[in-house]
């Protein structure tokens, strides 16, 4: 698949997450928007809520990870979404513009930023904490950076 610049989770781990949500999640129509879509919800080990939507016509798959949190306004406590990240694969579709060739699949991941009114209307790069939470959900160890170099030689 054609992978967008700056991805942190990666396509392979995304597909592992798709598999886990399909196996352990609950099938539901509450998260779908079109007729030929199938949806699943899954509650992660850390309380994060995952929604998976698969378009049966195109093969596109989208996972939204919401990390619930709390907020206090005056003397009221509110439940809010602390972090919303979306990961998706858009399958390459051949059409008139591709001259019969199927373009590569596209994979992307974004963090959705909420505005002052609570709607998610801006995007940013997925943060490392979110990726770490997903890797822990999948029981996959974090990739350690290579050691060595000058710091190693100086006795670090």
Q: Regions from the language model: what does each represent?
A:
Residues 1-156:
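Short low-complexity linker/loop segments enriched in small residues
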């Amino acid at each position: 698949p054609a992978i967008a610049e700056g991805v942190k989770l990666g396509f392979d781990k995304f597909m592992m997450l798709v598999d886990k949500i399909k196996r352990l999640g609950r099938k539901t129509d509450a998260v779908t928007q079109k007729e030929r879509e199938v949806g699943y919800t899954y509650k992660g080990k850390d309380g994060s809520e995952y929604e998976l939507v698969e378009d049966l016509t195109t093969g596109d798959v989208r996972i939204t990870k919401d990390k619930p949190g709390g907020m206090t306004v005056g003397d009221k406590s509110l439940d809010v979404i602390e972090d919303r990240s979306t990961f998706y694969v858009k399958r390459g579709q051949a059409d008139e513009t591709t001259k019969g060739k199927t373009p590569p699949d596209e994979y992307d991941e974004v963090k959705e930023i909420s505005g002052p009114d609570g709607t998610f209307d801006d995007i940013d790069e997925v943060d490392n904490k979110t990726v770490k939470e997903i890797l822990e959900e999948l029981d996959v160890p974090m990739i350690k950076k290579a050691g060595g170099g000058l710091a190693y030689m100086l006795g670090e």
